[in-house]
Amino acid sequence: MRLVQYSTPDSETGPQTDGDSAAQRDVVATNVDLAESILSQTRGLMFRRSLPDDYALAFRFDTAKTRDVHMLFVFVPIDAVWVVDDVVQRVERLRPWRSFERERCDLLVELPAGAGAAIEPGNRLVLESS
């Protein structure tokens, strides 16, 4: 699975990958883990000492609600991205041990610090099968 950003959102037709598309496609991460169980969602990136550059941890939810991200026991800075209906709502750099942020989302993505620098609110961010 990979995480892909489309710089020109088109909510009616979804992401377009053909050569005629006006949307610019950017692969953000090629190594994506899904946090599907309660245990994996609770643990998140806690206790990890490093993250590969092409890595993302994605949390998918059935409905868009306010979701928290804490950095307790997270030893590396990360970029967090909150997404509703494939549209980026917010991107934040979070510091180890100190940060706590919340935002409404149905997809939450945690990336290595700097990996979210080109992701902007309003762009589309989708999980695609490899």
What residue spans do the PLM features occupy?
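Compact, glycine-rich, soluble single-domain proteins
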Residues: 1-130
